[in-house]
A protein has these predicted regions:
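Enzyme catalytic cores with a strong preference for nitrogen-chemistry domains
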Residues: 1-188
């Protein structure tokens, strides 16, 4: 199986998550939600975390666990998302959004990082900002909130069918959804 995945390493080794069910390589956290619209065709090339869970007859939440990295001040616990995982309100599980941020926040992470290759489209950054605020606000009302970091690619890419441009617009969000810092677009 091929995964579109975040690979997490520390001191030259991929990080294991001991509580993780079998089925993934060390240090890997695959994309949970695959887009299949416009020029996206993830399911054609990759196996998603939802597909892995279904294939093993398990709940997808079993795989949405934090990574832990030792630091000089203690253990830093963080969660990862890939691109489409942010747009969770468009994907439901048991009639509720499949909110990986919420699951990670419930599991005591210190931060969540969304690593994206999200192409530029007109006013998409405003839509993304509203979506992040909505997700963080929903969790904050439950008394669960952590900072969120959106890290987007900059540049251009030819996928064989389309030429896509990526504007960056990396943004750090406070736990309440307000912007803490924002990088200049197109220059990262």
């Amino acid at each position: 199986r091929k995964y579109n995945a975040v690979m997490v390493a520390h001191d030259g080794r991929f990080l294991d998550r001991e509580q993780l069910p079998p089925g993934l390589p060390s240090g890997a956290h695959p994309k949970t939600l695959h887009p299949n619209y416009r020029f996206f065709d993830d399911d054609r090339h990759f196996f998603s975390l939802r597909q892995l869970a279904a294939a093993q007859g398990r709940d997808v939440a079993d795989w949405i666990l934090p990574f832990e990295v030792p630091t000089t001040t203690g253990i830093f616990r963080f969660g990862t998302q890939l691109c489409e995982d942010l747009w969770c309100d468009d994907y439901c599980l048991d009639s509720a959004p499949l909110d990986t941020y919420g699951l990670l926040a419930e599991r005591g992470v210190d931060a969540v990082f969304n690593l994206s290759a999200s192409p530029w489209t007109w006013q998409k950054n405003d839509k993304r900002h509203r979506t992040v605020q909505q997700i963080l606000s929903r969790q904050s009302k439950r008394g669960i909130s952590v900072p969120f970091f959106y890290v987007n690619q900059v540049g251009a890419q030819n996928n064989g069918k389309n030429i896509l441009v990526f504007d960056g617009d990396t943004t750090a969000y406070e736990a309440d959804g307000s912007r803490a810092a924002r990088a200049r677009a197109w220059t990262q």
